[in-house]
Regions:
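Basic, Lys/Arg- and aromatic-enriched nucleic-acid-binding interface segment
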Residues: 3-34
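Short, leucine-enriched amphipathic alpha-helices that occur as contiguous helical runs
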Residues: 6, 10, 21-23, 103, ...
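Short, charged phosphate-coordinating catalytic segments
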Residues: 29-52, 143
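Short, charged amphipathic recognition helices of the HTH superfamily
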Residues: 35-36, 41, 92-93, 99, ...
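Short, basic interhelical loop/turn and adjoining N-cap
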Residues: 45-49, 101-102, 149-158
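Basic, alpha-helical nucleic-acid-contacting "clamp/cap" segments
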Residues: 50, 59-96
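Short, basic (Lys/Arg/His-rich) helix/loop patches that form interaction surfaces
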Residues: 108-146, 150, 166, 172-173
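DNA/chromatin major-groove-contacting recognition/catalytic segments
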Residues: 157-175
Length: 175
């Protein structure tokens, strides 16, 4: 279990982040299981602002499945603050309004968080933690394969196996 970040650990990590960008990176990679490439391409136009929540429209690159996620509570405030400064076609993850961040900057943000927490944090580890908690919730391995385009064997199967052996306990993700 120590190999995977729990939702509580991610909440703690988000509270210790130095920037909104780091919080958004953690939220997107952990809560929705996005890849680094998918996170870098998110535009502010993919979010629909409502009075108490945001709707986030997203299509997975690998599987082509489209989703609409509801973002609310403290994460709503975080995204609303960032989105209110952007035009529809500007990327959400950016250094300043006119300079989107690169893969290297995103990985540096994760490294900075790892230094703060004195623990290794990678995008792959965040995705594996996302899968672990989904499987622990009771999502089947077949659903994971269909949704994320997972390999039928190897690491994803071991994550599923580990989640099944630990029982079904579901602390809510970040919402």
């Amino acid at each position: 279990m120590n190999d995977y970040f729990s939702p509580e650990e991610i909440r703690t990590l988000m509270s210790r982040c130095e920037s909104d960008r780091q919080r958004i990176i953690l939220f997107l990679l952990y809560n929705y299981g996005l890849t680094v490439e998918e996170a870098l391409e998110i535009k502010s136009g993919q979010f629909m602002k409502k009075p108490d929540y945001l709707l986030f429209n997203f299509t997975r690159k690998l599987t082509g499945k489209s989703h609409t996620y509801k973002i609310q509570y403290e994460n709503y405030r975080l995204f609303y603050k960032v989105l209110s400064k952007l035009q529809d076609q500007e990327t959400v993850l950016h250094k300043d309004r006119h300079l989107p961040i690169s893969d290297t900057i995103l990985r540096k943000d994760l490294f900075d968080l790892a230094v703060i927490m004195n623990r290794k944090i990678t995008s792959a580890q965040l995705f594996e933690s996302h899968l672990y908690w989904l499987f622990k919730k009771g999502v089947s391995f077949a659903q994971g394969v269909e949704e994320y385009g997972l390999a039928l064997s190897g690491k994803p199967f071991k994550i599923w196996e580990s989640a099944m052996l630990s029982g079904r306990l579901w602390p809510f993700l970040l919402e």
